[in-house]
A protein has these predicted regions:
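Bacterial N-terminal signal peptides
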Residues: 8-20
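N-terminal capping segment at the start of a domain
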Residues: 26-65, 116-118, 256-268
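Structural recognition of the beta-strand scaffold that forms the well-ordered cores
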Residues: 42-48, 83-84, 97-100, 110-115, ...
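A non-catalytic alpha/beta surface segment that caps or lines the substrate-entry region
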Residues: 44-102
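Solvent-exposed loop/turn segments at secondary-structure junctions
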Residues: 88-92, 104-106, 117-122, 157-162, ...
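Acidic/histidine-rich catalytic neighborhood of metal-dependent amide-processing enzymes
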Residues: 119-211, 236
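Active-site-adjacent substrate-binding region
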Residues: 190-295
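A short, hydrophobic C-terminal helix/tail in secreted or cell-surface proteins
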Residues: 297-305
Length: 305
């Protein structure tokens, strides 16, 4: 804070002494970053990148590997340091897709946004292409800016069989300085326009839960959130097991979703996926990450008159 005040004072003095200079500082804010989140782009990921149509199968069907490869290509296209993290499950090798946006001044400090891209043997539009599309859209937006801390975006595999991908990542990075992890899991079912979300996490994650709730209030365009206590059934749990602050952001009506783990959990099901609601969930998460990783404003520029 002292540095920012000093820069402002020096800038003011320079402008006062040299009236031929005019400041054109952009004044980049977290709100500016959040405004770049696009429902059109989010929908394109959900409809066209992750194989969410009737008959698709991201469980053990052919669309599983195709979706993984598409996620890798997207991360790589955003300029992230992209890799596959292999792990074993039931005698076979699977991989998490990891994209790293390295921080400028505190690269050792890490914030993670994750979602599982696998499904049961169905299209898995809400569970959980909706969350994975959110990670893709957040990565697209945040990769365009600089932050003090490092942002890591992860598409986890084999969540449905017991959180195997997130367990593998958390255990491999147990000594990292992970300051916060958010799992996006089922963020697109919003019957009757209730516009509510649930936040799950243990008491040890109370701080990150509160900060995410605040971000939802600030950047969620009318979404409200409910602290729903503890739930260990998503990819935040392995991070909490290692004492990292972590939480789950999920649609409020998750327990009443009639298409959960059904063949018609698909973008083709009429009046099912609420793209606007899901996009606002993503905007909230982008705001949280930009705030906590500390957005670096664009430098001031000056024009000679």
């Amino acid at each position: 804070m002292r540095l920012r005040i000093t820069v402002t004072i020096i800038t003011a003095v320079i402008i006062g002494l040299l009236p031929g200079l005019t400041s054109t500082a952009t004044g980049l804010t977290v709100g500016d970053v959040v405004s770049q989140v696009s429902q059109t782009t989010y929908r394109d990921y959900l409809d066209n990148t992750l194989y969410t149509h009737l008959g698709d199968n991201r469980g053990f069907g052919p669309q599983h590997d195709l979706a993984r490869d598409n996620i890798y290509s997207q991360f790589n296209g955003f300029g992230l340091d992209t890799s596959l993290q292999p792990f074993s499950y039931s005698g076979s090798t699977y991989s998490n897709v990891v994209g790293v946006h390295t921080g400028t001044t505190r690269p050792q400090d890490v914030y993670i946004l994750g979602a599982h891209f696998d499904s049961v043997s169905n299209p898995g539009a809400d569970d959980n292409a909706s969350g994975t599309s959110g990670v893709l859209e957040a990565a697209r937006v945040l990769s365009q800016y600089s932050f003090e801390a490092t942002l890591i975006f992860i598409a986890f595999d084999r969540e449905e069989q017991g959180l195997f991908g997130s367990k593998a990542y958390a255990q491999a990075h147990s000594t990292d300085n992970i300051l916060g992890m958010i799992s996006l899991d089922m963020i697109a079912y919003n019957p009757n326009g209730s516009n509510q979300a649930r936040i799950y996490g243990r008491d040890t994650s109370a701080s990150i839960k509160g900060e995410l709730a605040e971000a939802i209030s600030l950047y969620g365009s009318g979404i409200s959130s409910v602290d729903s206590g503890t739930l260990n059934a998503s990819d935040h749990a392995p991070f909490e097991d290692l004492s990292f602050p972590a939480c789950l952001l999920i649609e409020y009506n998750v327990w009443n979703n009639p298409y959960y783990h059904k063949s018609n959990d698909s973008v083709d099901t009429p009046d099912y996926i609420d793209y606007a609601f899901a996009t606002n969930m993503v905007s909230s998460t982008v705001g949280f990450l930009a705030d906590n990783a500390v957005l670096i404003p664009e430098p001031a520029t000056f024009l000679l008159l």
